[in-house]
Structure formats: C-alpha cells, structure tokens
A protein has these predicted regions:
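A short acidic, leucine-rich amphipathic alpha-helix
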Residues: 51-57
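Pre-recognition alpha-helix immediately N-terminal to the DNA-recognition helix
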Residues: 34-39
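Short, Lys/Arg-enriched N-terminal segment that forms or immediately precedes the first helix
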Residues: 13-26
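Short, intrinsically disordered or compositionally biased N-terminal tails of bacterial proteins
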Residues: 1-13
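Short capping segments at the starts of secondary-structure elements
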Residues: 42-48
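Basic amphipathic alpha-helical segments that dock to polyanions
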Residues: 68-78
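Non-DNA-binding regulatory cores of transcription-related proteins
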Residues: 77-155
C-alpha cells in the first residue's frame, strides 16, 4: 500500500462519519466500500483482508478478495485506514481512531497485543538518543514472544 508519509489520519467513530469522509473526497461510496467499512468498524481491532472477506458471510464472493484489497488500499490513501504487518502473518487493517495504539506481535503463536503509545516512549527515546532516528511503530509492531510462548521456550 502506498501511503504518503505526511497523510493526515481521518478519525471516524461510526459508519455515518466514515461514509461522509469517503464522500467528501469525491469518491463513490460503492457497495463493496460500504461492506469493508462496516467490517472494519464491527471489528474495532486490526484484521486481515481475508478476515474481512470471510466475515462478509457471502455478501461478497471469495473472488472478490481483490476488491477488498483495492478498497482497503483506497481507504488507506484517504487516511481512514491504518495498515501494518504483524510478524509473518498477513497485513492487518484498522480504522483510524481504533488503531491509535501500538502493537506487539508474537512470532510464535500470532497473538497481537495492543499497548498504549506511551508504553513505547522509552524505546523511541532510546533510539533517538542513540542515533537521532525518530522511530515509529505504526506500520510494523514490535515482534517477539508473548509471555506464554516465552515461558514455554524457557521450559
């Protein structure tokens, strides 16, 4: 997904706001776009395009997965949807406003755990102090082992 680094997130809290935000851009609010927005709002947590297609319960055919991806990309370019990768799994998508958290991804079991952005401030500060680099975790979560998998590995 190509998203301008200076794009402004468009935070929405309900379907009416999401639909209005799409219309303000001059884009049509197609049936597929509506279904994708409805699925994202219902989830309120990061989900994959496949999860969206599966959750539509036959309202879109499996061959329409490409349509789900196209709509997610368009909604991302508009600033309505945040996209990131969690470990080795598929990309995950969340509506802006529900994605204003940072994520930790378990590379063993796939657990995706959200944390407040402030929880990673120490990490950001350490990276900046060490290299001058301003770290962000909006596209890639911190990958490691969840407490359960780490305990299993320790034995």
């Amino acid at each position: 997904m190509t998203v301008s680094p200076d794009r402004k997130p468009v935070v929405v809290t309900d379907l009416d706001e999401a639909f209005a935000a799409v219309r303000r851009t001059g884009l049509r609010l197609t049936a597929a776009r509506r279904l994708v927005l409805e699925a994202l709002l219902a989830a309120r947590t990061p989900i994959s395009a496949e999860d969206i297609a599966d959750g539509l319960g036959g309202r879109m055919t499996q061959s329409d997965i490409a349509s789900v991806y196209r709509n997610l990309e368009t909604l991302g370019e508009l600033g309505l949807v945040r996209h990131f990768h969690a470990g080795h799994g598929p990309g995950r998508y969340v509506l802006e406003g529900f994605g204003d958290r940072e994520y930790l991804a378990c590379e063993s079991c796939g657990l995706l755990e959200s944390v407040e952005p402030a929880a990673l401030e120490t990490v950001r500060d350490a990276v900046r102090d060490l290299s001058g680099f301003e770290a962000g975790f909006s596209h890639f979560p911190i990958v490691g082992l969840c407490a359960r998998c780490a305990q299993k590995r320790r034995g």
